[in-house]
Amino acid sequence: MAQATDLLDRVTRFTSGFGVRGGYRAPTEAERSALLGGVTALFDGDVEKARTRLAEVDYRLDTFTDGPGGRRYAEVADAAARSGPADRGWGRVYVGLGAPVRWSVQVPHPIADQDTERLGVAVLRGAPGGVMVLAGAHRRAAGGPGGSDGDGEEGDGTGDGNAAGGGNAVGGGSGDKDGGGTGEADMAHRTDSVFHAVIAELTRRGLPGIQLHGFADSTVPGAGAVVSTGAGDAAAADAARLAAELASRGVRPCRAWSANCRMSGRGNAQGRLAAELGTRFLHLELARSVRADPGRRGEAARAIAAVTAGWAGE
């Protein structure tokens, strides 16, 4: 029987150890394949096969009931937890049980984009059939680039260029200090990670996703959010709905399809793949003042739930 616990507590205990001095190592192709094989088996409902494949790379699968939310989840996590530079930093995956997998919430920059991990939990709780893909390291771990915009947050940027630092980095940014990094642990701009591999599998299945980011209030003055469909437009109707829901809850959105918004994420690696495959993808940036206030963060989560509930078939 799944034990009762708190999803938010599990996530925040995990991310509380992140820092720019933390470790990250890109997985080998074999490691990535084994981990993805386990997660894919879990998506298909084969828990024992999932556990077997995950054990090949010292990952574990636990199930639990989220006390506050009441839903059951599976947690895919590193069983060989390490601290500091020795950490692999491959992240975690949380899968809602009791319903087919239908959509995802993606958190590529936990801690670096402050409270996006907390928002991710609230979003996952908001509708059945969800998957949360959570990065396992600070975006500047393992020697990633700096470039803070004032409160330690960089945003995802709008750049479409090729990044320096290797063929697995994309969306190099526009050169602005908030243009998004392409460091080894910047999951939004790399395609050789566990984070990208899991999202790529969901994207190939045609399942929609929303990726969460944060910006300093001074980066987009007057806006509490930037709503975008990234490099594609398959989620145009969803984006319009999300923007309207945010506005109705007092979070003023910049709509990237009708305005020249910074932080629109057109260089985002997962968004680019979604555009190639015609899968719905939403890129949401929230101002620090929205994320830092529990009430406003809750309103943002409820706005997102208006979209994810539709994805879940509710």
Model-derived features with residue positions:
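N-terminal catalytic or cofactor-binding beta/alpha core of small enzyme domains
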Residues: M1-G161, G165-G313
